[in-house]
Amino acid sequence: MEKNFKCWPKGIFKNLSYPEVPIYQILRSAATQWPWRNAIIFGGSELTYQELDQLSDRFAAALHSLGVRKGDRVAIHLPNCPQFAIAYFGLLKAGAIFVPVSPLLAEREFVFQLNDSGAETYIGLDLLFSMPQGCLDRTPAKRVILVSLADVYPPLYASAKPLSKQPFPEGVLDFTDLVSQHPPEPPAVQIEPKKDLAHIAYTGGTTGTPKGVMLTHYNVVVNCCQFAYWFGGGDVDYRDGKFGVRYEEGDGPENHPARRGMEVSLIVV
């Protein structure tokens, strides 16, 4: 086998470490190591790793109280915003499967993806709700949860006017209320990373009807580790429930892993 690495570039690892853990363990690790560091900056508002972890715990508890169980599909139809991250990690902690739905989809495509995925829970934006409101009755959606950007960033301006929160339609649940009304106590869900689905993401449909690509927790964690290697400069080092980085092949437990946390600036698109 070693002969295959004869011309291997110097400094490039021959193998990477892929821990068998649920995706949300990445967030839990960051919240433990850098609770005070910003995870997200959005138009001047800041959300730390600890806050993101706790808010997603609350949302997981909220989903569980609404009847969402392991393996259920939850569609997120949102632009970039802090609530997207909270909802994403929260639904995974509840054992549900993430179905990303682009805000750019036309009604026909929107209805197809919700039906094809079997998403019974829909999370959308109040400002973009007119199209979904007229067609959700043609989908499996039983629970409708709306997000308002006014809750996270009141000074946001649209058309030179302050963005204000309007009352939601009858029967629609308020994302902010759900999070605030539940404790940070997610349900105890056993995840088998190599078997349990985490995402059903749809292809672009350039050659036909979009297909739902099924990704396990392990698939997504592996992808994160690969990105961490190429952009962070080291292999993922997972010990004692924490993610770190090792820079040299052969680093053993005696080498303290470098711990780092980064922040993400979100722009609504």
Region locations from a protein language model:
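Conserved AMP-binding/adenylate-forming core of the ANL superfamily
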Residues: S17-P19, R28, W36-C81, A85-F89, ...
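Structural core segment of the AMP-binding/adenylate-forming
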Residues: S65-L66, K93-S180
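Conserved pre-ATP/AMP-binding loop-to-beta segment of ANL
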Residues: Q166-L173, S180-Y202, T209, D235-L266
